[in-house]
């Protein structure tokens, strides 16, 4: 049996795909120099009037991330107009951009765990070599 998806899930998936494409192509050419931005998630309201777009901004400081979110908010009419041309909907959701730090935070935690494991192994190796002497 086919898996059922709600309309909001299908719209969110389509908005995700199209906004990612817009950011990669049209927005990038308008803004110029910008860090790598990926769309990590999209939540669409039940009435399809609003879409929360969570973006991950790589290789940027916290301040640069805030500037990029502000810049995305300034260009949301431009992004929404292109989105309206690509989607076959009566009305396109209003876009709200948020910075998603979960991926970067996960990478940071993973690095900390790896460093801790490496320190423990080197300490264990030192202890083993001292016991053998």
From Swiss-Prot:
Tell me, what is an example of a GO biological process annotation in this record?
maturation of SSU-rRNA
Q: Which Gene Ontology CC terms are recorded?
A: cytosol
Q: Give the chief site where it resides.
A: cytoplasm
Q: Where is the signal peptide?
A: none
Q: What does this protein do?
A: One of several proteins that assist in the late maturation steps of the functional core of the 30S ribosomal subunit. Associates with free 30S ribosomal subunits (but not with 30S subunits that are part of 70S ribosomes or polysomes). Required for efficient processing of 16S rRNA. May interact with the 5'-terminal helix region of 16S rRNA.
Which family does the entry's similarity section mention? Belongs to the RbfA family.
| Name of the protein this chain belongs to | Ribosome-binding factor A
The organism is: Alteromonas mediterranea (strain DSM 17117 / CIP 110805 / LMG 28347 / Deep ecotype)
